[in-house]
Amino acid sequence: TVNTENEAYTAAESLMNETAVGIDTETRPSFRKGIMHNVALVQISTWDTCYLFRICRINNIHAIKQILESTGTLKIGLSLKDDFAGLRRLSPIIPHHYIELQQYATAFGIEEMSLQKIYALLFGRKISKTQQLSNWEAPELTNAQQLYAATDAWACLHIYKALKGEPLPTEYRKIFQTPQQKGIEKRFIQK
C-alpha cells in the first residue's frame, strides 16, 4: 500500500515506465441517500505488482494525476468514466491515453459489461466481490480488501492483453484463445 506522498511519487515514477497498466478505484460505500464519499483508494497494476494508493491518507492526488495525464503509459480500466469523475472531485484531471474495457470488449463480441463477468468468460475463473462494500477509508486495509482491490486492476490489464493477443502467464495460455485482431486497440485509445 502507498500511504504517503513520497511513496506515491516513487510508485508513479515506476508506473510511468510501463507501457500499459490496469486501473481501478474504490470509494467507501454510502448507505444513506444523498451522501457521497470521495475516492479512498486508487489501484494501478502492472503484470506483477499492484500499487494501492490510499488517497484518503495521502490527501493529494498529484502523483496519480501525473500517471493519468501521461501519454506514455496506456491506462486500462472498466467504467473509467465513473473513476475519473470521482477523482475530479478531488482535483482537476484530464486523463489521456486510456482504454475503456466495456467498449473494447464489444469489438470482440463480448456483451457482458461487468469486470467479473468478462473475466469469467475469458478465463473461466471468478473474481470475488465480497469486499466491494467494505470500508475503504479504514485506518488499515485488511488482507482481503487489499487482494480484492489489487485483483480488479490486475484483471483489467489481463483482459486487455488477452483480447489484444499478447502472451499471457502460463496458467492462462491453455484457457484463453482468441482470434487476434491486430491493431484494433488503436480505435479505442482515448487521446
PLM features per residue range, with description:
Residues I23-T25, F53-C56, G77-L80:
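Short His-Asn-centered micro-motif
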Residues F31-D48:
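A short alpha/beta connector and helix-capping loop motif
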Residues S30-F31, D83-L90:
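Short active-site loop/helix that positions an aromatic residue
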